[in-house]
């Protein structure tokens, strides 16, 4: 009996170990693919929203209402352009504010406030747009609210009357695109980072240990412009595995990460099921053999 039982026990142990190693590697591959797919999804969501605003503003820049507001400073023109801004906001609710600047950076009209005291001639997005380029800049702190915004600016007018049409989008609005959809799991952390790995926004799976203001990525830098890649980093005694994806048109990155204890739990759960199935198959085989004998 010993000569029969011991080899069987060894075979079961060896089979279980091989199963564990195989399933661990397979599950890690699945988890990494899921993290990568989620980062692509979130990054593309943000990119499409910003691109839609940019393209819509290029069309809006050709509006006669905008041109008339640059050429005339009357109350009638002002009311018409503000009504035009309200229509834009209705179509694109992600936008926080819309305003029109003249060629010196002064406010001609604004959706949320008159704000005639401020001059925006020193802003990067104004300088780029007044030179004829479409600009996407941010995050910058708004001069109207204390919140950080992304700014999309397009040139408007003609050689005689130049101006810049600007849309601002608060980070809070972008966070909806990052965090409020079904693909996000309660087990993963989602970060919006700048190119120094400074955290702009975060959705963390646990509330007991918040990440610091920036993430130290092991042997990796985002400032070199690499568009995507797997990374590891350590925080609060845990090691995290993640995938980052650069957002088009913005110098930002989406990072989807999961701490390795969560990875191991997922792998172990799947492996346990596989081992139990292997043991069950062996026991059934032995039982059938006994019956036949």
Where are these regions (language model features)?
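Extracytoplasmic/periplasmic ligand-binding sensor regions of membrane-associated signaling proteins
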Residues: 89-181, 232-235
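Cytosolic-side ends of inner-membrane transmembrane helices, especially those
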Residues: 3, 16-21, 273, 277, ...
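Sensory-module boundary signal marking interfaces of small helical input modules
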Residues: 23, 174, 263-264
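Extracellular/periplasmic juxtamembrane segments that couple receptor/chemosensory ectodomains to their
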Residues: 158, 163, 206-277
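Short N-terminal helix-loop-first-beta-strand/juxtamembrane motif that initiates sensory/input modules
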Residues: 51-59, 86-107, 133-134, 179-200, ...
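Short amphipathic alpha-helical segments
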Residues: 32, 36, 40, 54, ...
